[in-house]
Amino acid sequence: MKKLNKLFKYFVYVMPAAVFFSYEPVMRLGVSESMNFELSIPLIWLVLFDLLVIVMMVKKKLLLRDFKKKWVWLLFPVWLSLSVLWSMNFIRGILTAGIIWLLYLAIDGIWTFRKLFDKEFKRVFLKWFFGASLVICAVCILQCVLDLVGVAREYSLICQGCTYAMFGFPHPDGFSIEPQFMGNLLLAPTLVAVWLIIGNHNSTPRTRVQNPCRHRGFGANSRLARLRNVLGVLLLIALLTTLFLTFSRGAIYAFVVGLLVMCGWMVFEAGKERKNVLKRVGLVWGVVILSFGLALNIQGLMAELSPTDDTYKSGVAKVLNQLTLGVVKIDDNSPVDVVENIVENSGTEKAVFDGYVEESTDTRLRLAGAGLKIWSSDYATAAFGVGLGGAGEALYVNNLSPAPKEIVQNQYVSILLETGFVGVSLLIVTIILAVKLILKQKSRTLVLCLMIAYAVSLCFFSGLPNALHIYLLPAVLMFL
């Protein structure tokens, strides 16, 4: 059993690295009118991890133990599986249900064997966690450079809508399918880094946020402690700058919401240490502003250096215009001296977009509205939905989308449309159970704020295979 326990730990160690490969490399197994059949590294990890969990549970005779205590948790996945029977896309429904059960088994395994997460495990896990995050940040920067110098997309792995041709500067997607997924993948490491910085110097037992990176024998004023604090700030700058470079409104908005809740929560719970906590909060917001300014300058510089006719100022203007939904507008008539001596821009290409892309927002709102329209069309659909995996087919059949592959780009509307009022009600019950469980953990502030950030981000997309980290990472971070 010791070998299995060790293997279990190794699987959890590599999970943060595995989830970053959410789309590339991908194993393409086939295609149909309504979906692509693909296998990614996170899915392979999930299957192998579940096989290990089953073996461990069988050896310890835990597979069906405490079933009476877990039955409420199973109501939601059972209902989703039943809804496949009337799904308008049976194959997609079956595959989606399979992934959901794999996730449930993985999370149950993490909970069942949580005693393996000792202090040494937490220390090693954070090394893997932040190490993988820094590597992916470097990959994103490299991706931008490769795109600017004209390296083909099949080598840079940047998506078609992410190249400099769109806005005049590239926005990286790493090994994910789109920048919004890359930005979403950075939410967890960024918020964990924030949590460690704010809680690092709390001293009273009541308010202290335990920092797994701290070692015995070193006080808050020691040289090693100060070095760790500096490295923590540099880590946060790298993560935040990359997050802003993804140019993903959904991920950036989600981060800001999660950060606001975390800061407010930790200040509220600080008690007598509130003054110290407020200083750390101020430091974090200073780092956020610095990182945003750094990313903004990098995007402006990339616009100046790109083959398009964009300038530093037009690049900055486009970023601010897009992130503020067209509210902030900067006129690009006057010359800018910041980078005029760096390079003479002789680009003749014209970028596709001049700023805020209303079509992106309109498409999301249109699909969400179409989903709600179908859901409310009759009592049966309102109560039971069109079946798991059937949202795209339902939109197409009702002439509300151009192809059955089109999906509702809002996870909540998608769940409502596919599983009906019953499914949403069971989801709410599951969330309540999860929150009650998380509130008993030391890292409750971190995990709940991360879940809030993920909840906000799910308003901008839907789908399981490219976002397994949303469900797996909180299950492990709960035990930091």
Model region roles, listed by residue range:
Residues 49, 258-263, 447-459, 463-480:
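Transmembrane alpha-helices of multi-pass inner-membrane enzymes
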Residues 108, 206, 396, 418-454:
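Hydrophobic transmembrane alpha-helices and their immediate junctions
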Residues 70-76, 90-112, 124-133, 156:
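Aromatic-anchored transmembrane helix interface
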Residues 9, 78-84, 123-160, 164-168, ...:
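Alpha-helical transmembrane segments of multi-pass inner-membrane proteins
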Residues 1-57, 81-86, 253:
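N-terminal signal-anchor transmembrane segment
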